[in-house]
């Protein structure tokens, strides 16, 4: 977590530089020295405000997660409360379109996922992100099916989002948001049909 007093103009600059360097050389090659060069600041600033590379990675992921949350909220707020299928697709778009699909963001996400398996602070951020996604999905799904069914289908959609996102991240052509929507909507329609016959 950055120390109080960190100039607000520096934080976005350092976060952007971190993602750019991870995009270029990977997480292990992304040294404090390279990041500070990219940001045009001294290494001492990173060490002083973030305690080093780990603290800067944590702040970078917080920023990415904030942007994801803001984008999802903005998309949801633009739609009627009763437009549940549209709102589910807005959640999908927040994960697959725009900022979240940029190469430097994708590579930072991959580094984050890898690191979060062995780091409590990053693992906590991952859990917060997962809970937020499931909460958004369940809110819409509960209007279409029972709470128990909504819990299961939300987990299925979240797994599809992660799987499609990971496959797209490893594909040189990147993430295909349209294909992601088709696959997930096909799954959702099948689940709705299945549960309507129960």
UniProtKB/Swiss-Prot annotation:
Name one process (GO BP) from the record: negative regulation of DNA-templated transcription
Molecular function in Gene Ontology:
DNA-binding transcription factor activity; transcription cis-regulatory region binding
The free-text function statement in the UniProt record for this protein reads:
Repressor involved in the biosynthesis of the osmoprotectant glycine betaine. It represses transcription of the choline transporter BetT and the genes of BetAB involved in the synthesis of glycine betaine.
Name of the molecule in the record: HTH-type transcriptional regulator BetI
Look up and give the organism this protein is from: Vibrio vulnificus (strain YJ016)
InterPro entries per the record? Answer: BetI_C (IPR039538), DNA-bd_HTH_TetR-type_CS (IPR023772), Homeodomain-like_sf (IPR009057), HTH-type_TetR-like_transc_reg (IPR050109), HTH_TetR (IPR001647), Tet_transcr_reg_TetR-rel_C_sf (IPR036271), Tscrpt_rep_BetI (IPR017757)
Keywords assigned: DNA-binding, Repressor, Transcription, Transcription regulation
Q: Start and end of every HTH tetR-type domain?
A: 8-68
- Family matches, as PROSITE patterns: HTH_TETR_1 (PS01081), HTH_TETR_2 (PS50977)
Record carries keyword Transcription regulation = yes
Q: In which pathway does it act?
A: Amine and polyamine biosynthesis; betaine biosynthesis via choline pathway [regulation]
| Superkingdom of this protein's organism | Bacteria
- Give me the positions annotated for DNA binding: 31-50
């Amino acid at each position: 977590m950055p120390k109080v007093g960190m100039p607000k103009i520096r934080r976005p600059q350092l976060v952007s530089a971190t993602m750019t360097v991870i995009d270029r050389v990977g997480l292990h090659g992304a040294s404090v020295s390279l990041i500070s060069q990219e940001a045009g600041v001294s290494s001492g600033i990173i060490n002083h405000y973030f305690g080093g590379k780990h603290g800067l990675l944590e702040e970078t992921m917080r920023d990415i997660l904030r942007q994801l949350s803001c984008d999802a909220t903005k998309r949801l707020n633009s739609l009627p409360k009763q437009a549940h299928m549209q709102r589910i697709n807005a959640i999908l778009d927040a994960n697959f379109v725009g900022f979240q699909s940029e190469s430097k963001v994708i590579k930072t996400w991959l580094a984050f996922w890898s690191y979060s398996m062995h780091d409590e602070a990053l693992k906590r951020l991952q859990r917060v992100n997962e809970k937020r996604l499931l909460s958004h999905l369940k809110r819409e799904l509960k209007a279409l099916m029972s709470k128990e069914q909504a819990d299961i289908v939300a987990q299925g959609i979240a797994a599809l989002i992660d799987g499609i996102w990971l496959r797209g991240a490893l594909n040189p052509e990147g993430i295909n948001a349209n294909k992601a929507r088709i696959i997930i909507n096909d799954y959702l329609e099948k689940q709705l049909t299945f549960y309507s016959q129960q």
